Amino acid sequence: YEYRKKISTIDGILICGDIAFSGDEQQYNSATTFLNEICNALNLDKSHVFCVPGNHDIDQKITSSQMAVALLQKKLDESKSTTEFDLNLGKIFRKPEDATVLCAPISCYNNFAAKYGCSFDQKPTWKQEIAINDTFTLCIFGINSAFISNEHDHKPDQTERKMRISRMQIPERKENTVYLSLCHHPPECWVDPGKILSKKMDDRIAIQLYGHKHLQMIRKTSYGIVVGSGATHPSRLESDWMPRYNWITIDIEFEKEVPTLIIKVYPRVLDDIESKFIPDGSINGEYLNFSLKGRNIRR
């Protein structure tokens, strides 16, 4: 379904992690080739690809064999509170040699992502800005949620170990700026007592995009939307196998000088004969429309 023919400008490609299957260099070579083809088809420069790592971007050969990596991950994983985790992560990133060790399991991801300005070699976040209009800027904000991911992500009973993010990975408010975040693990997969982190995300970020779970989920928050984006290439062994992706458009309209953020999400799914992606028939109409006012869209 060639939706690109219906819109005037395509500004970027957003990837919420699990670009590889096991953090292997050859897998990223394949991903680079694939993204080059998409960029060429959409007339996009590669600087307009935005991505974050997921648990499948972790090279478990490194986490299972390098004691220095294991010790730093253990220190973070055993943090007894969000505040302690913040302090421990901050200490690591203030020492370049420690940051290099912690990020070793995503070294192949970082080599791949550096082409797009989205590596996490010496920092826990990245950000890039795109003008929406003469007044407002879209700040795309990448968050690494896979710092402690390793071969122990699944417990003996097959439940998933929860990941960690830090308050320092959540952006500060900025006038005339609309935040769009990319993070692989959704809030329900975080260690987040009292849901302080997820509430802070809802309070500051207008558009939150997540991966990890292969089922699409879109919900509105008090000040924005959250999109669990499904998967473009899930395992065929999954019982609810459904390859999908989304188009997202962003605009700002003014009503009596009050700015309103207009977001349209166009879900696309693979058709029955696995030939092309088509509009998701489970929603009413071709897209989901959200109009947002309030603290995440203001001058």
What are these regions (language model features)?
Residues 135, 187-260:
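Conserved beta-sheet core of the metallophosphoesterase superfamily
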Residues 145-209, 218:
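Active-site-proximal segments of metal-dependent phosphoesterases and phosphodiesterases across multiple
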